[in-house]
Amino acid sequence: MNRRSITIISITAVICILISIVTLGSCTEKREKVDLSSITNISGLAGATIAAQTGTFHLDALNSLGNVNVKEYEDFSKLLVALKSGAIDGYVAEEPTALSVVAMDPTLDYIHLVNNQTGFTATDADTGIAVAFKTGSDMVAKVNPIIAGISAETRSALMAQIVTMSANTDKALGETLALVSSNTNTSNGTLKIAMECNYAPFNWSQTTDANGAVRIQGSSLYANGYDVQVAKYIAAELGMALEIYAVEWDSLIPGLQAGTYDGIIAGMSPTSEREEQVDFTDCYYNSNLVIIYKKAN
């Protein structure tokens, strides 16, 4: 072996050692966490690492702050994993979601924010959720009177029941749900509704049909949650049978546009951007946006 070969090998060895040192350093470097437990106003989030779900108003609202480190994840299960692992300090969610998450995990809590006061700047359309139908569909005109007939008291009572159910999804609630239709006639066909089935308390998957859960098409699992019960009520009032389809968030609107589903009931806000793609009913629920965080040890 000549000197040149030895020199090349030596240089290569040094480079490998340097890469190893840098890699080791980056692996052992820890992110400085921010304690959110004493924060009562959104201004207190400065410098924190906060996440939101991709493609949602939550992410838009978060990006508008400008003083936080923003991360995004494709669904709420990944947001929860990131929070528990310490990758983020908190994430944006509707208050019912926060209530559900906290009820299931005592190590978590949330910042009680109020829209346009201590919290995010948002309109009712931004934080409300509505049913989406294909552009030009006559279903909006049919469903709006049904939604209008659901009182604010019934909506709140149903959400309280749903949050309780979400803490133990396969356990019977032991009481009649606040929103139930008396119509059992399904002669008007089938209503195909898409949702994530992964966004408690609005929609989730469970192993049994407890508490009026609906079998997910093409799956052995059942869907339940606020969206499911609203979908059941709307379908019943229309005299239709209900089918639930589990669909990833980014595929919901394309699937509706393609005619794969009749509607979307998935905790979806009727933002101006989405209104260019689909038609929305009036909102069937409104909520504050809050921040879920992990309690300090």
Where are these regions (language model features)?
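Second-shell loop/turn segments in exported
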Residues: I88, I129-A132, P145, I216-N224
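Acidic, polar ligand-binding/catalytic clefts
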Residues: T28-L45, E95-D126, F133, A236, ...
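Sec-dependent N-terminal signal peptides
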Residues: I6-L18
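Solvent-exposed, polar/charged alpha-helical surfaces in well-ordered, non-transmembrane soluble domains
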Residues: T40-S43, T56-S64, S77-S85, P96-A103, ...
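C-terminal motif of bacterial Sec signal peptides marking the signal peptidase cleavage site
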Residues: V22-S26
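Extended ligand-binding regions for polar small-molecule ligands
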Residues: T28, T54-F57, T121-A172, V228-E237, ...
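Extracytoplasmic small-molecule ligand-binding "clamshell" domains
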Residues: G47-A52, S64-S85, E94, N188-M268, ...
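Bacterial Sec-exported substrate-binding components of ABC uptake systems
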Residues: V34-I42, I162-G189
